[in-house]
Amino acid sequence: MRSCVCYTLLLFIFFIWLRVATCSSFTDMESLLKLKDSMKGDKAKDDALHDWKFFPSLSAHCFFSGVKCDRELRVVAINVSFVPLFGHLPPEIGQLDKLENLTVSQNNLTGVLPKELAALTSLKHLNISHNVFSGHFPGQIILPMTKLEVLDVYDNNFTGPLPVELVKLEKLKYLKLDGNYFSGSIPESYSEFKSLEFLSLSTNSLSGKIPKSLSKLKTLRYLKLGYNNAYEGGIPPEFGSMKSLRYLDLSSCNLSGEIPPSLANLTNLDTLFLQINNLTGTIPSELSAMVSLMSLDLSINDLTGEIPMSFSQLRNLTLMNFFQNNLRGSVPSFVGELPNLETLQLWDNNFSFVLPPNLGQNGKLKFFDVIKNHFTGLIPRDLCKSGRLQTIMITDNFFRGPIPNEIGNCKSLTKIRASNNYLNGVVPSGIFKLPSVTIIELANNRFNGELPPEISGESLGILTLSNNLFSGKIPPALKNLRALQTLSLDANEFVGEIPGEVFDLPMLTVVNISGNNLTGPIPTTLTRCVSLTAVDLSRNMLEGKIPKGIKNLTDLSIFNVSINQISGPVPEEIRFMLSLTTLDLSNNNFIGKVPTGGQFAVFSEKSFAGNPNLCTSHSCPNSSLYPDDALKKRRGPWSLKSTRVIVIVIALGTAALLVAVTVYMMRRRKMNLAKTWKLTAFQRLNFKAEDVVECLKEENIIGKGGAGIVYRGSMPNGTDVAIKRLVGAGSGRNDYGFKAEIETLGKIRHRNIMRLLGYVSNKETNLLLYEYMPNGSLGEWLHGAKGGHLKWEMRYKIAVEAAKGLCYLHHDCSPLIIHRDVKSNNILLDGDLEAHVADFGLAKFLYDPGASQSMSSIAGSYGYIAPEYAYTLKVDEKSDVYSFGVVLLELIIGRKPVGEFGDGVDIVGWVNKTRLELAQPSDAALVLAVVDPRLSGYPLTSVIYMFNIAMMCVKEMGPARPTMREVVHMLSEPPHSATHTHNLINL
């Protein structure tokens, strides 16, 4: 009887448990489905979390992608990173009270964190990084999560002070709060974490002193506090007691003072990053006690003295970065003996004497950069002994002798920069065949001999051999350099004709072959090289005429053929070259009259001086200088009249024939139009493909540029659209992902992004359809007749709006989108003068996609290109930031980025030069010296504030520039003084 009762009791308990488990299981499924609906948002793809569907099964939800359950079918883990999702976290997340791991990283989730998160008391791992969560971080919500070990909120939009409640989480080991907008100082209480091993607070807006009490974190192994924080004072010497530290990063955070010798006690440290600060004094020799050290970066400070000899004990060192300091003396011989050294960067110091001849003999050297020092002697022969060396950077020194032959056999090399030395001899021919080299710069040396007839560097983007003693003919084999963008052969002794093959290179942008002994005509292939932005063929003995079709070079900014023997009339078509800002045809044999109108209004008479038979509108006599006029006089009046009659008859007949053919072709075109063109819409459009194509007429053209020709199209329903006909981007079988990428761009929706409505395509052409912007581009307003009407308040507003558009591309798109061609002409204004960023993501499609599948090397427009592009041939978000900084300078100064400051000087260089010329330099004095004279009644503090942001954006080093998110934050929240109008300037 007793056993029967026990059995019944157990059965009853089992059914109770089963009912509870069933209810909990179905509750979890219901919560997951609500979670899906909220997290997807309106922009997510239809297949996002597609398998999260209701199914009448207790365990169905446990098979959802990214979901893990325990034995009781309760959800214990969710990982939905990289979906992407565009919604928010709903309150229902709190119902999943058995969750131990919640990972929603790499999405576009927005809003504030729901207070219901506090119910997740079992949570051990919370990762919400790489989203757009905002507001103050709710530390009180996290406080009940007493089991939490990992908290990662990197790259969001959290503001306010750092959450102090987190110190009560006794099991917390990993805390990553970087990449937000936290402000204020680091709380002293952060020294009270019990178990913390990883702490990263970098890339915020923190200030104050770094608390020395952080040294009490005895379990800490990783500490990162730098990057765009701005602390007061220096490195706390107490940090030397943190014996468990393996990684210490205090870079780019305004630290001053000397490096504490007490850091030598960190014997377990393998990484020490102190770069981009204001540290002074010498490098402490005591740091040699850090025998575990592998990476040491002290670059971009004000350190003095020599490299300590005691550093010979750092046998594990792989990276030694000391560049941009004031270090002096010689490089000790032990540096060449460090067995693991891979990176040695000492550039921009005061080092001197001969480099250790044993450099590279360790067999691991990859990156070697000693640019801008005072080194003498020979280039070490064994730099590439390992076959791993990627960069040789020795520009601006006093090296002599030849380049070692071993360098010509170093197939791992990607960059050779050896300009401005005293090197001589014949350059090893193997250098011009290295498969991976992207840059060869040998300018301003004493090299001689001929270039090898065989050249085949398939990756070479920059070839600079200027100001040497090279002789012989320019080899046609240059045509093999399909990635070449810059070719500088000026100031040598080359002879013969310019090989036409040079201008068949699909990516060529800059050509300088001036100052040689070249003869013959300018190759006609020049007019096909539509990527060109600068051409200098001056100081040669070229003859013939400027080739017809020069107007095809729509991106050309500089064209110099002065001091040659070129003849014929000045081409009329130059008037249509709107990008051309510098033209020099002086000292040639041009004849006739200089055309007027169009772009000719930009050029002065100096551009045409030294041509005896050429006159301008001010210097021409009444009689024409054209030879045809003299011929007409010799024919007499009767002959001239007869000729005119014949010409008129022929013209009328030809016109009638053309009209008939045109009518026939138009009818035929309309019949076939719908069959040859296809419209792909990204939203509801009330027009057809043939309506778009009908607008491709000369009279509808509203712009031409590197991205193609832009037409204004009026659709039958009354809608106006902008139609961009892309250059060199076909849509046939070999479109190299064009359709996929354009469709991705078509899904982008932001108030300050020019909306892509759809595209029309056939086998040869792609037409992109955008919303029409009636007020044109910012460039037109700044540099055209309208500039005087663009008041300061409007300029500032446009800057904020454009920054928000770029910020969206960089931080809110997944994957992020690099614009690649930020400029004032790509910031368009709608009817309310609201800014819209245009042409984003198009730069990679501007060249023939069949020529190369490597499109990432297209950098942007002349004057906007970041300086590091010359070294890397790559662009990233910080390249866009630099270009945006140039746009900010345009808004302040009102001048184009190039062409108005003298040869070789752009707007950034001019501003820096102006600063140096001021008797009493200050921000106010500099702004008053450069500000647009058309501005009046502007608040000086506001202009200074935006000017300082612009100068942050155009810093020479990419890592030192702010992100676009930081730019938006700064522009949107100026200090109180910058918004006041008490300091108005009237000019």
From Swiss-Prot:
LRR repeats: 96-120, 122-144, 145-169, 170-192, 193-217, 219-241, 242-266, 267-290, 292-314, 315-337, 338-362, 364-386, 387-410, 411-434, 435-458, 460-481, 482-505, 507-529, 530-553, 555-577, 578-602
InterPro entries: Kinase-like_dom_sf, Leu-rich_rpt, Leu-rich_rpt_typical-subtyp, LRR_dom_sf, LRR_N_plant-typ, Plant_RL_S/T_kinase, Prot_kinase_dom, Ser-Thr/Tyr_kinase_cat_dom
Membrane topology: Single-pass type I membrane protein
Keywords: ATP-binding, Cell membrane, Differentiation, Glycoprotein, Growth regulation, Kinase, Leucine-rich repeat, Membrane, Nucleotide-binding, Receptor, Repeat, Serine/threonine-protein kinase, Signal, Transferase, Transmembrane, Transmembrane helix
Any Pfam family the entry gives: LRR_1
Catalytic-site annotation from UniProt: 821
Name listed for the protein in its UniProt record: Leucine-rich repeat receptor-like kinase protein CLV1B
Provenance organism: Glycine max (Soybean)
